[in-house]
């Protein structure tokens, strides 16, 4: 019987086909959110910290061992576009 891989399974290597891949566990999850509106007014330091905690809760539902220091969020402007970049360092996958 063939199994369809779910999004989270393929991303975090939770199915049998990815179980042997040590590199999968050390890769970063990168998410870039871009908005034509200015983010400065909406994203204060407090809101970014709250966002980090909420993201950490969701990630830890699928990958154990991610700490708040493993979540990095950066805001920068490029021309008329604001970019919010998030990097999450995942712990090593143990066999």
UniProtKB/Swiss-Prot annotation:
Name-wise, this protein is Cell division topological specificity factor
Q: Which family does the similarity line name?
A: Belongs to the MinE family.
Function text? Prevents the cell division inhibition by proteins MinC and MinD at internal division sites while permitting inhibition at polar sites. This ensures cell division at the proper site by restricting the formation of a division septum at the midpoint of the long axis of the cell.
The family database entries (Pfam families) matched by this protein are listed as: MinE
Origin superkingdom: Bacteria
Keyword annotations from UniProtKB, A to Z: Cell cycle, Cell division
Q: Which GO terms describe its biological process?
A: cell division; regulation of division septum assembly
Q: Report the InterPro entries cross-referenced here.
A: MinE, MinE_sf
């Amino acid at each position: 019987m063939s199994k369809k891989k779910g999004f989270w399974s393929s991303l975090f290597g939770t199915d049998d086909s990815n179980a042997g891949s040590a590199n999968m566990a050390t890769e970063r999850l990168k998410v870039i959110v871009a908005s034509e509106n200015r983010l400065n007014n909406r994203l204060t330091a407090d809101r970014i910290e709250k966002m980090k905690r909420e993201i950490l809760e969701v990630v830890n539902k699928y990958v154990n061992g991610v700490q708040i220091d493993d979540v990095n969020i950066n805001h920068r402007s490029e021309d008329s576009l604001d970019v919010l970049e998030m990097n999450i360092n995942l712990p090593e996958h143990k066999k």
